[in-house]
Amino acid sequence: MNFGLFFLNFQLKGMTSEAVLDNMIDTIALVDKDEYHFKTAFVNEHHFSKNGIVGAPMTAASFLLGLTERLHIGSLNQVITTHHPVRIAEEASLLDQMSDGRFILGLSDCVSDFEMDFFKRQRDSQQQQFEACYEILNDGITTNYCYANNDFYNFPKISINPHCISKENLKQYILATSMGVVEWAAKKGLPLTYRWSDTLAEKENYYQRYLTVAAENNVDITHVDHQFPLLVNINPDRDIAKQEMRDYIRGYIAEAYPNTDQEEKIEELIKQHAVGTEDEYYESSKYALEKTGSKNVLLSFESMKNKAAVIDLINMVNEKIKKNL
């Protein structure tokens, strides 16, 4: 099992954007030190509200790569359906070369109808647009060239500069946003990053479908390493841990799930993430990782208000990782 971090960068009431971003920067600078055994860090993409204030995760990743020496850093969910695939290929290739292969490209379909409309994309062909975008940018990364002649893009063969030095070895992950995306990823043998806001049952359904489709298409998934994002808030007082998590995710849940029982959704997520006392999270987290075939666990400590306690918890997790190396 490999461990990394992910950052949602929610700006809660009373917080400044500087404080939110500084928290991410300081945490990554801490775990980049040689004595830490976290391997990766990922930045979430979100638009138009404070429920995630980074709209350009690859830009944030470029700063963090320049700040660090050891960690592999990338986008958690760079949305490709609403961005031009050539620009993504160019940026990914540049970051790959400048970071000496430490950049990770996490990709996603769009999960917001408003964003699809805002960026003038057609909802009824969303899956096809996602797939077309991926083929273009992946060609650019792996062959240094790409062209398009489809329903969405039409341009002659062009060169991607600078060339991506990692090419097919540039690590890619696909956010599990729908069953269609999961089935497509399985056919290509691309690893998934599960959504933190999906229930465990939804994640498990995606994993089982991934296994089925991969088998039907004779795809070898021996080395596929799915990623499980885990929200963490550990406190000697479980009530404090749970309330801090409620306060942290409530705004996003209200925005992303307007037609559900939001309080019920929040309580369900609290049960399925690492929230409570030190003795309460291990078995449930281990069970979730097994049920989703996850080989990587990504941790977010952002809901914890006591930053000294966050450092202590990171150090505790690091010692446990070290003992199991």
UniProtKB/Swiss-Prot annotation:
Recorded hits in CDD domains, A to Z, give: Alkanal_monooxygenase
Q: From which residue to which does any coiled coil extend? A: none
Q: A Pfam family in this protein?
A: Bac_luciferase
**Which superkingdom is the protein from?**
Bacteria
The chemistry this enzyme catalyses reads:
a long-chain fatty aldehyde + FMNH2 + O2 = a long-chain fatty acid + hnu + FMN + H2O + 2 H(+)
* InterPro entries given in the database record: Alkanal_monooxygenase, Bact_Lucif_Oxidored, Bacterial_luciferase_CS, Luciferase-like_dom, Luciferase-like_sf, Luciferase_bac/NFP
Name the UniProt key words of this record, in alphabetical order: Flavoprotein, FMN, Luminescence, Monooxygenase, Oxidoreductase, Photoprotein
GO biological process terms, semicolon-separated: bioluminescence
Give the EC number(s) under which this enzyme is classified. 1.14.14.3
Where does the chain cross the membrane? none
Q: Name one GO cellular component term.
A: cytosol
Please give the subunit comment from the record: Heterodimer of an alpha and a beta chain.
Q: What does this protein do?
A: Light-emitting reaction in luminous bacteria. The specific role of the beta subunit is unknown, but it is absolutely required for bioluminescence activity.
Task: Tell me the protein's name.
Answer: Alkanal monooxygenase beta chain
Organism (species): Photobacterium leiognathi
The gene it comes from is: luxB
